């Protein structure tokens, strides 16, 4: 994987993305179909995907709600925890749009993928990617809900709780195991390719930022293009070694929380400040670089303070 990125750069990442997304979509629809037929068959409705979907709506209607109900004094701790993860309509008014606009619009790792041969190509690519994103509830969420319903009703006991230890992260793989052998292998290969492509994009982004914004700007302003490419490749190797060191013996303390959850928590400390800096920089001409840095630092400090002091003060109170 590392050798491929070092030798190929964004060109390899682009080709890999195109291939793996096609396979992922096909495998995703196949997994959803299998999940829904498993539900319908378990409830004696035959192998009917539509009947399986209707059964999900009947059995677990709250899993299809966009807004989680606010907990009451009689609510269980599980219900409170779910609400804290998706805290009502306030999340949509004051949280998600900031995180999403920051991730999709102010993140070099993402914006580098939107570059095209011309403006029209770039715009078309972004719109097409947005359309594919709309498929996520079908190919990702439905199999997870199906696994939940099946487990709750006595199925998938061994798959979801190997050795008697329940793990919700096993939901998708539990459904994936029922795919035909060829499709199962294809889906696993696509998932692996997606992971590799994602890591490749991050590594390339790290190399670009260090080479162009740090090395070429402050360390060697007259560096040739050939030297910059060499520095970029060295940066990729160093970043991969550093990442391996941090994963050794769980140095970051991620534990069983999962890497994605861990990363989202801590990037959330800086995303509001970064987004505000970009927003003001685009629409207010009097914004300066110093003001942007000050806003970024202030936003980070406020986020850390809110994370530490707001939960004990407000508990699950929001609107």
Describe each model-derived feature in a short phrase.
Residues 1-319:
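Membrane-embedded helix-loop-helix hairpins and adjacent transmembrane boundary segments
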């Amino acid at each position: 994987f590392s050798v491929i990125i070092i030798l190929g750069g964004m060109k390899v990442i682009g080709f890999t993305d195109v291939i793996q997304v096609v396979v992922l979509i096909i495998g995703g629809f196949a997994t959803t179909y299998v999940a829904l037929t498993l539900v319908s068959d378990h409830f004696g409705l035959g192998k009917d995907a539509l009947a399986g979907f209707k059964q999900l709506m009947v059995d677990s209607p709250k899993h299809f709600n966009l807004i989680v109900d606010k907990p009451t004094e009689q609510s269980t701790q599980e219900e409170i925890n779910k609400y804290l993860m998706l805290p009502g309509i306030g999340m949509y008014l004051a949280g998600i749009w900031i995180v999403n606009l920051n991730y999709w619009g102010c993140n070099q790792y993402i914006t580098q993928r939107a570059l095209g041969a011309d403006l029209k190509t770039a715009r078309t690519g972004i719109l097409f990617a947005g359309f594919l994103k709309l498929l996520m509830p079908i190919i990702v969420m439905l199999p997870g809900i199906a696994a939940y319903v099946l487990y709750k009703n006595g199925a998938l006991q061994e798959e979801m709780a190997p050795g008697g230890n329940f793990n919700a992260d096993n939901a998708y793989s539990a459904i994936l195991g029922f795919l035909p052998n060829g499709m199962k292998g294809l889906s696993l290969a696509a998932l692996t390719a997606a992971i590799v492509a994602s890591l490749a994009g991050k590594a390339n982004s790290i190399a670009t930022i260090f080479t162009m914004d740090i090395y070429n700007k402050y360390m060697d302003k007259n560096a040739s293009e050939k030297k910059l490419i060499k520095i970029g490749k060295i940066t990729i190797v160093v970043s991969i070694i550093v990442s391996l060191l941090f994963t050794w013996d769980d140095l970051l303390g991620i534990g069983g929380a999962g890497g994605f959850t861990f990363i989202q928590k801590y990037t959330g400390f800086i995303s509001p400040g970064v987004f505000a800096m970009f927003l003001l920089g685009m629409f207010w001409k009097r914004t300066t670089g110093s003001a942007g840095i000050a806003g970024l630092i202030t936003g980070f400090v406020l986020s850390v303070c809110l994370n530490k002091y707001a939960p004990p003060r407000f508990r699950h109170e929001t609107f």
